[in-house]
Amino acid sequence: MKRAKLFVFAFMMIIVTISCGNKDTKNIISIKKASSEKLISAFEKFENNFMLQSDLFDHGSAKAEFFLTDYDLEGPEAQAILQSTTIADTIIKNKIGITGLWVNDKKAQAFKYSYAFNNILTNEPKTDLINIVIGQKNIEAASLSIFTKTFSIPAQDLGKALALIDSKEFPANLNIDLTYNTLKALSSIRPNKASQKRYDKAQDILYKNAVITRNGDTYSIVFNNDDVIKFIPALIDAVKNDNRLTFLWKFYEKLLEKEFKEIEEKFNTEIKDKIKDCTFTETLSITNSLVAQDQYTVTVSGKEIVTFDCGIKNYENPIDELTYSFTITDPETPDANIVSCMFTSEGSVTDTVADVNCSLAIFFTDNPNTPLLPVFDMHGAFYADTAKQDDNFQIGMDMSITPSRNSKTNGAIEVSMQALGSVVKAPDMITYNIDTISMAMDEAEKGKHTLKLGTEASVIFSKKILEDIVMPKETVNVLETKVTEWQTIKEEVMANLKALSTMLNL
């Protein structure tokens, strides 16, 4: 989830912070910076008020627990299943659950992760599945139930460890800087000063010779094609060296070295020439000195083939009527969209109440000559009111997928999930309790199936470390371990797994 969020906001920053050298441009950049700041601040307000994100990524922890207490099933085969004893009945009877813990230990400079089963073994209330610690020097992993030592590799040598597992998929030179500071940078929405300067440099290139005209509160911009060609590698350099993204870029650049070179070659031999045949424009509408609508288009022979549009209606509550759309059109076929994406949101966020709905729809061309990808439509909702005492939390998602004509599945598939419970906010902690989870799937050929779960589940966000994750002091250096030593470790692990299987509480 963090990578997706980071990409969205990095993209937004590129779109809404553009600069060039004349008076109109200075006005545009000032307006866009103010608009960008208001939009990002609103998102940060939501995250900080309801998930303590800024505090957690400075120092804190999060904990999730799940216990099943009841279940009910509806559908064509529901009665036959309910009349027999299932593994769910055993899980409920023996109070088997799962616990996840995430810790950001600022003092130790380490992210710590722990996953454990509750009551899965006889007479053992908690069984560690895996514990992981990512520090500035080493990455450590341990599973105390099956091995009493900690596996350790240098934090910058994760690629070498992956190459030991599968040398065909992971090259030996895949040195990944997966340190505490790297992961911490990934959590930031805003780039550091050096990264921002690179984006500014790329934007200066793009707008150096742009033609800007103004009609009231609307700006029309036509970009110079040679500047567009120079802008693309400058933007790639900015993304590549972005303090938040450089880790991911270097990882994929080495993992997909051949593909990266092919893209670069194609840009230099084909794409540059095609860019010269295009017209690149922007239309910017301003309301109350803030961006109300911003549209970018790429046109070939008078036909728009790429369109990106974003709109923000109310900056006091930006989440309400926020829209983003992206369309790629077939230049040779009238009114035929190769792909069309639309994101919309509505609702409101205050210090105590968040009531947010968002939708994402993706459509592909229905062309008999090309494979048709599914139509995807998703809706999500989040509601929390920390001023109320009960029934003040709800989160849900529903999704509809229309398969392609070549798919073996006939008709749309509809999936939905909803969780109900309560939220309690203290000065240094937020606790979400989940009482029921409802899931449904409706398929044309199989009918509708509904599953309702009674749960004792919770998610806690805390400014403090709720509990620490302790690793075994004795370590195994993964990169220095010999084949014969691995065989001994394997035998010990298998023996412990066999012993544990006799203690299963299932």
Residues covered by each model-derived region:
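Bacterial N-terminal signal peptides that target proteins for export
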Residues: M1-V8
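C-terminal motif of bacterial Sec signal peptides marking the signal peptidase cleavage site
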Residues: V16-S19
